Amino acid sequence: MIRVTSPTKMDDRQLNRLIKRVLLLLVLGTIVFVGFYALDRWRPATEPIVDRRLSAAEQAVRDKPEDIASRGQLADTYVAKGRYEDAIVQYNLILESDKATEQATYGRAGAYMGLGQLDAAATDYQAVVDIAKGGEMAHVDSMLQASYYSLGSLAMQQGKPAEAIPFLEKALAIKRSDADALYLAGTAYVATGETDKAETVLRAAVAFVPIGWSEPYAALAEGFTKAGKTAMAEWAGAMADLAAGTPDLAEPRLLAIVGGDAAVDAAIGLGLLYETKGDSATAAQWYARALEKSPENAPARLGLGRVGAGGAASPLPALPEPGAPAGGNE
C-alpha cells in the first residue's frame, strides 16, 4: 500500500525538500528544451556563394578541359576571389587556343590591374581596342568602351592627363551616360586647363549622380578657380559639402551667393538640399526661384517636377554619412 503524506501534516523540512525537487525538475526541463530548440534551429554554416561557384567551375574544367566557356568562368571567378595569378594562367590557356581572344585579353587585363602591373594591363586593354574598334558593333561594344575607359584611367594614374583625354572621349562616344568616364574626363580637362570642356562633362556627371558623390563638384570647384570664376567655385565647393553628407556646411555657403553671379545654380543647390531633407515645399520654392531667372533650366525643371507643389515625397536617395565612400555609376 502506497503511503501518501497529507500536505497538512508536512513539516517545514519536508516542504522545503519538495520545493527544491520541483525547482530542480523545472530547471532540468528548461535545459533540455533549450538544448533541443537550439539543435533544431542550428544549421551548418553554408559555403559562400563565390566559393561554391569556384568549386563548380574548377570541377567543370576538370571534367571538360577543352571547354573554353568553363575555363573562362573559372578565370573570372579567380579574379573575383582575388586570385589574380591563377586567373592569368587560365586566361593564357584560353589565348593559346585562339578562341575568345577579346574576352580573355580583357579579363587578363583586369587580373594585371589587380596585381598592380599597370603596363601589362595597358598592353592588354590596347589589344582589346585593336581587336574591337573595327567591328560592326563597335559603337555599342561595352567591352571596347570599358577598355577605352581603363586606358584613360591608367593614363591619369600615371599623371598623363593629355594622353588620357582621347581614350575617355572615345569611351564617352560609346556610352555618354557613363558618369565615371564623365568625371575622369573632367579631371583631365581641368589638369590640362580646358576649363570650359571640364565644366560641360562634370555638370553632366553630377546630372546623373546629383548627391552622394562629391568628387565631381570638387573638380568643378578647381576648374572654376582656374578660370577665375570665384562665385561658381564657391557654389561647386558648397555642393561638394552637400554631396559629402554635410548639408549644414553647404547651406550657409549657398545662401551667401544666391543673390550673385551663381544665383541660379545656388538656388537649384538649395532646392536639392531641402529636397534631400524631405522638405518638398521649401525645395519647390528654391527651384521656382531658379526658374524665374532661367525659365528653361533643365535641372530646376526636373527638381520642381520631382517635388511638385511641395507635397510630393522626394525620390532622391538619402545623403551619405560624412566620410563614407561614394562613386558614380558603373
Where are these regions (language model features)?
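Flexible helix-coil transition and linker loops at the boundaries of alpha-helical arrays
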Residues: 59-64, 130-143, 214, 221-225
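Register position in tetratricopeptide repeats
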Residues: 80, 114, 131, 150, ...
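Canonical tetratricopeptide repeat
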Residues: 73, 107, 143-146, 150, ...
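N-terminal leader/linker segments that initiate helical-solenoid repeat arrays
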Residues: 2-73, 77-92, 96, 123, ...
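Short coil turns that delineate tetratricopeptide repeat
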Residues: 65, 99, 133, 142, ...
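TPR alpha-solenoid repeat register
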Residues: 70, 104, 137-140, 147, ...
